[in-house]
Amino acid sequence: MIPVRCFSCGKVISNYWDEYKRRVTDGEDAAAVLDDLGITRYCCRRMFLSHVELIDVLSPYQ
């Protein structure tokens, strides 16, 4: 689960996650996808580049 807002600046970023993930999975360059989506701030870009999906790992321990 991607955070709804950037931790640093507060910009809403979660609405871009599905498009970003789909395009990167299809083989596009992550930097080019972020540029195309209009994610230009370094703080917001790091939210996408450093995100790791842990929900599937943690869900068995509920």
Curated annotation (Swiss-Prot):
It catalyses: RNA(n) + a ribonucleoside 5'-triphosphate = RNA(n+1) + diphosphate. It is an enzyme of class 2 (transferase). GO terms for molecular function: DNA binding; DNA-directed RNA polymerase activity; zinc ion binding. Its EC number is 2.7.7.6. Zn(2+) binds at residues 6, 9, 43-44. Part of the RNA polymerase complex. This is DNA-directed RNA polymerase subunit Rpo10. Keywords: Cytoplasm, DNA-directed RNA polymerase, Metal-binding, Nucleotidyltransferase, Transcription, Transferase, Zinc. The gene is rpo10. It is found in: Cytoplasm.
